[in-house]
Amino acid sequence: FPSDKLNFLIRKGNWEDKDVGHDRTIEVKNGNNVEVWLIQGDENIYYDKKDVDTSPKLVSALMDSKIDLLVTSAGNIEDSELDSFKLIDKTDNKEFKTSAIKVSDNKIKLTLKKGLFRTPEIDPSHDYEVSSNNFRATKVTMRKILDDPEYFYNGDDLGLTYTKDSSIFKLWAPTAKEVSLVLYDNEGTYDENGKVTDNTGGREISMKKEDKGVWSLKVDESLEGKYYIYKVSFSDGKTNYAIDPYAKAVSANGQRGAIIDFSSTNPSEWGSVKKPPMLNPTDSILYEMHVRDFSISKDSGINNKGKFEGIAEE
């Protein structure tokens, strides 16, 4: 190999899905030969077969409505095993009564049973687990339940709403236990890979959870020139630093959101340009242009080839 590392991912069919949620890397430690072992749904890479746990396990449990889960196992599920499946709320240390029916040889639909007065409610911010007598337990992932109207937010104000006197931050995160805004005076320190991995040292301000799974915060001061990210904590104990998915300006390589007064960035006569009215958005035709491809030809007549400056030449 030209490198001692090999990046890879495993896909299902024609990219219907991929195993685990991110790319992985194999380390080629000795020579050009390496043997690895992979387990479906397990992000670890095993270099020795004896390290692999091949005992029967549940691969996934997807919460697809307020009462239904799709559970997949690594092996066939016998009819006699259906009554042993359990849904546990690990946050509240509580077990739900459920019923199970087979969808295929290795899939079941697990449904919450109605209680004396009503069906128990699922809180997407809690940590849930599905287990059974013959399969190792798996964590529940909130999937189509988040399409429920209770969590569907159709507002147009997610992200940062900036004014000179105050800034409002909104983040849709229905599975989060806690969310904080973290403010910085600079873009952070970059490592050799162009990433900012140390996000400590910022000013943390707790956000408030509102309807539809939206977290909100208003800061009554001028934040122009600051940088920010969100600190998101979950019921399973994990905490992630995440850039605002609705950020309109970011630092290099998208490591932190940048707080900018966009009115100050407008060129002269910016507001005097009138665009034709958009009568129907579905009639739009969008074109994509690459700066280099557009300008690099020797016959282009452009002096600053491959640069934005070249596109502006007259």
Residue ranges and their predicted role:
Residues 1-211, 217-224, 277-287:
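Insoluble glucan recognition modules
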